[in-house]
């Protein structure tokens, strides 16, 4: 899904550039009501932060349970999704997730 927000996938693009820019504009900051960490949000999307590392400052997406994550980076033109067979027990900072994201950006 995230790949189709930054470009076409099999001829389909989910949102226009203008809609994407509108959706990822930071609309709120401060402690998240559930996670209690400072996380900037656009319209339904987490933005890159110290707590929710999504690759770069042009990334938008969302973390899920146990270290799963999905995001897009419109400047790097990538979509990324990761789910695992064994969930991490922490609320943030799964080293497997961080290592995969780092490897993607190192390969660009």
Stretches with model-predicted labels:
Residues 2-108:
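Catalytic loop of the DD-peptidase/beta-lactamase superfamily, centered on the K-T-G motif
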